[in-house]
From Swiss-Prot:
Gene3D superfamilies documented for this protein: MetI-like
Similarity comment: family membership: Belongs to the binding-protein-dependent transport system permease family. OppBC subfamily.
This protein's name: Oligopeptide transport system permease protein AppB
Primary gene name: appB
One family name in Pfam for this protein: BPD_transp_1_N
Top-rank taxon, per record: Bacteria
Organism: Bacillus subtilis (strain 168)
Keyword set, alphabetical order: Cell membrane, Competence, Membrane, Peptide transport, Protein transport, Sporulation, Transmembrane, Transmembrane helix, Transport
Keyword Oxidoreductase: no
UniProt keyword Transmembrane helix, yes or no: yes
Membrane-spanning residues: 10-30, 100-120, 138-158, 177-197, 240-260, 290-310
GO MF term set: transmembrane transporter activity
GO CC entries: plasma membrane
Amino acid sequence: MAAYIIRRTLMSIPILLGITILSFVIMKAAPGDPMTLMMDPKISQADREQFIEKYGLNDPQYVQYLKWLGNMVQGDFGTSIVRKGTPVSELIMARLPNTLLLMLVSTILALMISIPFGVLSAKRPYSKIDYGITFTSFIGLAIPNFWFGLILIMVLSVNLGWFPTGGVETLNTEFNIFDRIHHLILPAFVLATADMAGLTRYTRSNMLDVLNQDYIRTARAKGFKENRVLFKHGLRNALLPVITIFGLMIPSFIGGSVVVEQIFTWPGLGKLFVDSAFQRDYPVIMAMTVISAVLVVVGNLIADILYAIVDPRIEY
């Protein structure tokens, strides 16, 4: 296993390098620049040139990229162009916990809801319960996150007043864990919706295949209780493909967090990325791209490790 992890880590290096190159090229090709957006049009030519020289914007693009790459390898993501020279690492570390919390809670919600409903749907195939779960899953797959989030805000927050419209905590109040949870419920649920629906369908499909296997019929013939047959003998084998699919869904969690954080004004990396993209804050955009790519690579590696833990027959 250790050799496999090392091999996968080494294989990830050229992938991450390619992502940074592609992101840098696209970013530079986009219209506009931070100087135009943030500087006073009446500023003197000398001050304008000083600004350009300070951030190296007059260097050839490949020189800018190599300088950034060299600093990034040393753990230095540079300073924000728009935010008065604030180190990018400080901006990220201030918002990273909020994004990780949102993704963690969304993941737990998706697993806690999708797996039991998938098992229930497979236990009673083509019943009213199965049709209801299937119908709900298809709706969850079809509804865009941004639209669903806005509907929930309008109904549950604006009209009924059950939840706050956004933010991570109530302004001008001391830290309160229940207040944080209250603010977290809606964005976490919206982020989990699409993946919840997909995982429910995958769990149902895999459980149906497993429940038709000979060893399941043997377990039932021995008189084991149905719940033991379903969860001890059936679910463990049905979860193998689900773990793989869940690893592939990690990019959707990261991409979805960008939309959800913007809608709910959640102060996380997704909102920071969108704000920086509009402001053409190049150092922040590049740092966010690297972090997102690393999270995807690490997430898929964890999925592979869990796959081996669940199924001892698999060796790396």
